[in-house]
Regions:
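Functional cores that coordinate and move charged inorganic groups
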Residues: 154-159, 166, 170-249, 253, ...
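Active-site His/acidic residue clusters
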Residues: 131-136, 212-222, 229-247, 260-264, ...
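Bacterial N-terminal signal peptides
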Residues: 9-17
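Structural motif
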Residues: 34, 161-162, 206-208, 276-280, ...
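N-terminal catalytic scaffold of extracellular/periplasmic and nuclease hydrolases
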Residues: 22-172, 176-198, 202-203, 304, ...
Length: 389
């Protein structure tokens, strides 16, 4: 009799648990901030954490996972294929951008968000036509088709975008002025940083000089790349001579955090349907290609300032998810034995190209628990889509 009573009680508890699970609602996610560190592996994150005296944004209680970064045809992805995986949830061949291995157009998470009535935005410290941002709106079989990519940008439907690359929009072989096209489509177009900062427009594109979006290091080294890999713009920027070393060291770059804050302000205005904002720090990759320890740490410091600002935003907006990851790792970066006495970790690099090592995933805010464990790069946009539907 006692055994029967216990069995009945256990079954009753099971019924209640099952019923409860059946009525559980998924976390409500209205807004998504997608922060991508191009080339940012665990070595880059470690270099930041060990260099700082106070807690970084990476240490502010995120849900942590790891992501495989393979492309469709190689263990080591390039930026076009890596960006495509993070944007569309589909792996493609190296060199391909926004299309599958057969060259068919893919639909990015930004496009899907637009179909749901959400606003969308892009902020990058490189050109708007570079591989990662382009993966969210374009479809081409080569990243070198920058004029085609710029033309596709005019059809992207994003509400706000800030980056560089004006030549791709106006100094074109087809003689088109794509800034005029954007204006015809209802955008305000700004070509200076001051105008971007001071605008109250609800729909704008800022196409700025490269010097405004990135203060780069002065040296004469040529960016290196592994055999078979083309030298990316980020590596060229990281090795260019736009500013002196003294300028770079004395004036921390604030572009990414200020441009991100501006985009958040625009996307949040009178917006009940939510938004997705993609932000990329592209130059981490460049310093990895150049095996430049000092530059990598400084770029990670800018990334962290932006990250901490975004964490503050989601803490004030509880229906917002922040996902931080990388398209791949660059440089084979690790922490060396030397440097402890000086309080500055010494980095060691194993390559001047990309590697196929797993990259970190940090998630904060609403729905963050979905991003724990080991996952594929394609899982990340799929998880985001599931949470916002």
């Amino acid at each position: 009799m006692k055994k029967n009573v216990l069995t009945s009680a256990a079954m009753l508890v099971l019924v209640f648990i099952t019923a409860g699970c059946g009525t559980m609602r998924k976390t409500e996610v209205n807004n998504v901030i997608y922060l991508i560190g191009d080339g940012m592996g665990l070595g880059a994150v470690s270099s930041l954490i060990l260099s700082e005296n106070s807690a970084t944004g990476f240490e502010q209680d995120p849900v942590i996972g790891l992501s495989e970064t393979c492309s469709a045809n190689n263990y080591v992805t390039d930026s076009p294929a890596g960006g495509t995986a993070l944007a569309t949830g589909t792996r493609t061949n190296n060199g391909y951008l926004g299309v599958d291995p057969e060259g068919r157009q893919l639909t990015s998470i930004l496009r899907k968000a637009q179909d749901m009535g959400k606003k969308t935005g892009i902020v990058v410290n490189t050109t708007l036509t570079e591989a990662t941002p382009a993966a969210f709106y374009a479809g081409v079989t080569s990243r070198k088709k920058t004029f085609d990519i710029a033309k596709q940008f005019t059809e992207s439907g994003v509400d706000v975008a800030v980056g560089a690359g004006l030549d791709h929009f106006i100094n074109r072989p087809d003689s088109l002025d794509l800034t005029a096209t954007l204006i015809e489509k209802g955008y305000d177009v700004y070509l200076s940083w001051e105008k971007v900062l001071n605008t109250d427009s609800d729909k704008f594109v800022g196409i700025l000089p490269l010097a405004d979006v990135h203060r780069s290091k002065s040296d004469n080294e040529t960016a290196g790349a592994a055999e078979g890999q083309e030298v990316c713009l980020a590596a060229q920027l990281a090795a260019s001579a736009e500013d002196t070393d003294a300028t770079r060291l004395s004036e921390p770059t604030v572009y990414l955090e200020k441009a991100s804050a501006k985009a958040l302000d625009v996307l949040s205005r009178d917006n009940k349907d939510g938004f997705i904002l993609m932000i990329e720090s592209a130059i981490i990759d460049g310093y990895g290609h150049n095996n430049d320890q000092e530059g990598m740490v400084e770029e990670m410091q800018e990334f962290d300032r932006t990250l901490r600002q975004l964490i503050a935003y989601i803490n004030e907006h509880p229906k917002t998810l922040l996902v931080v990851t990388a398209d791949h790792e660059t440089g084979g970066t690790g922490i060396n034995y030397t440097g402890y006495e000086s309080g500055k970790p010494s980095l060691i690099f194993s390559t001047k190209g990309h590697t196929g090592t797993l990259v970190p995933v940090f998630a904060y805010g609403a729905g963050a628990e979905a991003f724990s464990g080991i996952m594929k790069n394609t899982d990340i946009p799929e998880k985001i889509e599931e949470l916002i539907r």
